[in-house]
């Protein structure tokens, strides 16, 4: 958060006592974090580390070229990666049905040969179990896993005047 606000301490990815936090700078380009994660994951595999690289994006990020490149690269090299896709049904204000014909965003992982799960993202236990299983699979050298989390957007996408009622019905919001 400090880095995004221009504070110099935000560039220091360590704890207060100087220990590294195993993180990298936030990626501004949507979907590009998947390319970075795939590279880090391949490095972890080559060093035989019991670790995985994680990357997160939302519905819209799965329609970016970098998303496909990262997922495909990680799959081809069986890199130690776990990819999360938060599916709240909208890429900002674009409904999923207008941004992709895929029946589930997890299908985009399947298309690259990656085991992909669809999980109730509103269920903490289901999320924990899916993430734990995915991490074990990837860390064992079996290749990446993609987890699509079905969620609800509880607030507007941004604070820049995004009124969800312009593109969502009250019934849709109340359903959650």
Kindly give the residue locations of the regions a language model identified.
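Conserved thiamine diphosphate
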Residues: 45-49, 102-133, 175-176
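Short internal beta-strands
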Residues: 78, 83-86
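Cofactor-binding active-site loop characterized by glycine-rich and histidine/acidic residues
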Residues: 1-79, 95-101, 106, 111-113
